[in-house]
Amino acid sequence: MALFKDSSNFFLLAGPCVIEGEDMAMRIADKCVNITSRLDIPYAFKGSFKKANRSRIDSFTGIGDEKALKILARVRKEFGIPVVTDIHREEDAVMAAEYVDILQIPAFLCRQTDLLVAAARTGKTVNIKKGQFLAPDAMQFAAQKVADAGNKNIMLTERGTTFGYQDLVVDFRGIPEMQRFGYPVVVDCTHSLQRPNQTSGVTGGQPELIETISKAAVAVGADGLFMETHENPAEAKSDGANMLPLDLLEGLLTKLVRIRAAL
């Protein structure tokens, strides 16, 4: 991946679930950049400019598309790092591509051909999250849609598989299975711990297992990790129940670098 410097480490996509404001985004980016620089981890800042897929109609969706995208552009410029955001509609692809380096396809949308093709045609790296309903082997077809549209800058992300009602499980056999397609494979260490569609209308999670999933991902040879992190997850406007507190990030990454070095 030309986006990242050469390193023997995994790369990291990390940041808040959604852009809540400029000051917070800059603080989180600053801390993540400092930590990953010290640990020699290639890093891209993640932040959704809009959350289109929410449980309830009154759930927070964003501060405004253009405003959020301009914040992502500021992070990109001031820290000199790649930036990733989700897109949900074909028209989002061209709009977001002006501000970010990686366009992320949400898991629920990973089979949407027109969306994948629109993302591909921007020339940006496309990170496709594996649907909770798909076998790893099926992701070759999502990747092929992007490649056939003329873009081979592709990443695939494991984010858990539906396990009965309101639960997900990560099958780590899927990492080497997807790596066979020739693209970097990322493990989403926070969304894979969601407890979706709770009766309250707010998605739950098991953040106490983030370290477990992260260690397993590195041990099995994942190319990259995806983590959502926040200064105070309890007050986050989206996905707070499965985010990593920002003050725990350095300790966790330090352990993961040691595991990677032992392989």
Regions found by a protein language model. Give the residues of each.
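N-terminal amphipathic alpha-helix/helix-capping segment at the start of soluble metabolic enzymes
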Residues: 1-13, 70, 261-263
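Structural preference for beta-strand elements that scaffold enzyme active sites
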Residues: 9-13, 40-46, 82-84, 101-102, ...
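Glycine-rich, proline-tolerant flexible connector loops at the mouths of alpha/beta enzymes
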Residues: 12, 16-24, 43-65, 229-239
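Active-site mouth loops of central-metabolism enzymes
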Residues: 14-27, 55-63, 81-86, 105-108, ...
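Alpha-helix-loop-beta-strand connector modules within alpha/beta enzyme cores
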Residues: 31-39, 58-84, 119-125, 175-185, ...
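C-terminal alpha-helical cap/extension of soluble enzyme domains
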Residues: 45, 199-263
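Catalytic beta/alpha-barrel core
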Residues: 63-64, 78-92, 101-114, 125-136, ...
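Catalytic alpha/beta core domains of metabolic enzymes, predominantly
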Residues: 123, 127-229
